[in-house]
């Protein structure tokens, strides 16, 4: 399937989930409890990326998809839900490993984040190959603002987009609609970083 897409000039990305294992039918805690911490997520126990073997598990999985199946890129689901102290080092380590693969094979490999924290510092669409950064972020701000404008729904995280037209304009001009302002959905906690210096290609 991927070869057929490539023959037609199409890239193929795979959506991968490294922020949690399934909450039901997941027996990994019984056989490998070191994979988890005492922290909890909406999807079960938090993954213990401070453990070297656990980090290697995720990185090797990413490389497997990219090297053996020749996917052109990965979209990392909800990385803001990775529960580790400070900046999740797994993100940088994974990007560096993928960058090494891209350099070794001469391929263009793309890494895209879903990150509700709007972390501009981890994005660098110009780095070739990517080694420590990510080419782009799934920009939910733009979608959420349009959703509120078109449907009127403003509950939950949509609460932050009640001024939808202004958020749409800011997303088009600067990328993120939230760049460090207090978020009502997060009970006044600041959300996001300045993103106006990034090109449009950094936002999907």
What are the functions of these language-model segments?
Residues 1-70, 75-104, 121-122:
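Substrate-binding/active-site clefts of carbohydrate-active enzymes
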Residues 91, 95-204:
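Conserved alpha/beta catalytic core and glycan-binding cleft of carbohydrate-active enzymes
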């Amino acid at each position: 399937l991927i070869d057929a897409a490539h023959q037609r000039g199409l890239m193929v990305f795979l959506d991968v989930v490294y922020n949690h294992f399934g909450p039901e039918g997941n027996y990994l805690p019984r056989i490998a409890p070191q994979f988890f911490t005492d922290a909890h997520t909406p999807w079960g126990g938090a993954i213990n990326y401070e453990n070297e073997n656990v980090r290697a598990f995720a990185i090797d999985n990413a490389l497997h998809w990219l090297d053996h199946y020749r996917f052109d890129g990965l979209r990392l689901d909800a990385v803001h839900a990775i529960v580790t102290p400070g900046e999740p080092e797994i993100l940088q380590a994974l990007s560096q490993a993928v960058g090494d693969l891209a350099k070794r094979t001469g391929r263009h490999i793309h890494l895209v984040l879903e990150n509700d924290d709007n972390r501009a510092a981890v994005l660098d669409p110009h780095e070739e190959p990517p080694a420590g950064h990510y080419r782009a972020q799934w920009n939910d701000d733009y979608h959420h603002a349009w959703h509120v404008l078109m449907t009127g729904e403003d509950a939950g995280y949509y609460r932050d987009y009640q001024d939808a037209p202004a958020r749409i304009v800011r997303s088009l001009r600067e990328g993120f609609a939230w760049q460090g302002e207090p978020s009502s959905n997060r009970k006044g906690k600041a959300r996001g970083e300045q993103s106006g210096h990034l090109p449009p290609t950094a936002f999907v």
